[in-house]
Design a protein with these regions (language model features):
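Accessory beta-strand-rich segments of carbohydrate-active enzymes
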Residues: 2-4, 11-17, 37, 54-162
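Surface-exposed, low-complexity/disordered Ser/Thr/Gly/Pro/Asn-rich loops and linkers
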Residues: 47-55
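Short, solvent-exposed loop/edge segments of extracellular or virion-exposed proteins
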Residues: 48-49, 162-165
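Helix-terminus loop motifs that line ligand-binding clefts
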Residues: 42-44, 57
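Predominantly extracellular/luminal regions of secreted and cell-surface proteins
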Residues: 10-41
């Protein structure tokens, strides 16, 4: 198995995504590096759903997008994304196709993205973070991608990383 860290240069947008181009929303897209907690950047309000447990921070939906090159040579391999932590209710889309929905924000997870890839081309990875069920912790949990993301490629026949105990 070979892995590549892809924590750098993600496009970040806080707020609901609109299908139609909007010049004002385009201004709100900015580049971030991981780990990234967007909750700490949000407004403080006494009416925040988590109240004092979150320090009165509000959350909302956010999107992280990145184009990744997948070499043609990987076509006969399995390609995975491994996430060390996303808080929470994360949907991972590859080229517009939902690859996984991960509810728990504290558990690392991996997803096989091979079926969704265009080999020898750039591929769009979009991660939607929607920590809408509040309160979700007894302490400040943050919101966003708070750990690293690794791009893994390996032979199609392999032992799963969590397959031996």
């Amino acid at each position: 198995m070979r892995n590549q860290n892809i924590d750098q240069c993600w496009q970040f947008q806080h707020g609901l995504y609109d299908e139609f181009p909007d010049a004002e929303k385009a201004k709100s897209i900015r580049e971030v590096n991981l780990p990234h907690d967007y909750m700490i950047e949000s407004n403080v309000s006494e009416s925040a759903a988590s109240g004092p447990a979150s320090g009165y921070y509000t959350q909302g939906v956010a999107y992280y997008t990145k184009l990744i090159d997948i070499p043609q040579e990987w076509e006969q391999e399995a390609v995975y994304l491994h996430f060390d932590g996303i808080m929470m209710n994360a949907t991972v889309d590859i080229n517009g196709c939902k690859a996984i929905l991960q509810h728990n924000g504290y558990i690392p997870f991996s997803v096989n993205i091979t079926p969704y890839l265009y080999f020898g081309k750039k591929n769009r990875v979009t991660i939607t973070v929607a920590p809408s069920m509040q309160p979700n912790s007894r302490w400040y949990s943050g919101a966003g991608i708070f750990r690293s993301i690794e791009l893994l490629h390996m032979p199609k026949l392999h032992i799963a990383s969590d397959g031996i105990f």
